[in-house]
Amino acid sequence: MHLVYMGQSAKTENGASDPNDPFEVVAGLMLHETQVTSVNGEFDALCRRHFGSSLGEDGTPQMLRPLDIFEGLEHYSSWTPEKRSQMIQDCLDILIRREAPVLSAFLNNQTFAEARTNAASPAALLWNEPIDPVMSRFLFALSMYLDEMNMATLNHDQIMSGAFPVSQFAMVLAQEGASIQQQMMTDFLRSDEGVDSTGLHENICVVNAQDSPAMQLANLCAFFTLRWLQTPENPNPFFEALRDNKVIQVLYPVSL
């Protein structure tokens, strides 16, 4: 079973969508269930190295918030840019060493608002918030990615016979208080595109990001994807490191 931790680019305290963000971005970090323990261990060791103790203990933040680290806010106000950059890179290296795949989908929020206002796209009227079409497209991309993984495991006899046994499965995990809801999965699996997505677990599991190192790493991926979308003409070394080292596998621009 693959666990897909849904990072979001939102800057709000509880992870909910921020209306001031120009893009709605989700980043699904896919880890096999056998990898989670080692990721947690590396993450805790990293935090002890940078903070002197684990997250949540005296003198340390409760969790890693990408905006705070990147801009030197809150706990990081006294840190030098070099120290903050090193911590970010150390976090990303946990994923880079494993080539842990990240699948991202994004939508320009202004495009969404204009499509609904002008009724330029009938499909836009089916969605209430930008996260709705973004998650629909993300789940489609995840389903296709699982299909590719399943195809890669087929032997010659299975291919010749047309057999397509499903051996790769994925469960989506959303962070508590965020805008990803169970109904999004239910609607996708009932749609024409999702009806054959036999590798997707039908339930979305909700976790507290403070208790999930993988979710915090997924949020970092979403944050730096957002920064790349905002200023694609500028150097974005953290995003480029993820992309060039085969972590970011899918970048799905959602259209309406």
Which positions does each model-derived feature cover?
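Phosphate-ester processing/binding pockets and catalytic centers
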Residues: 1-256
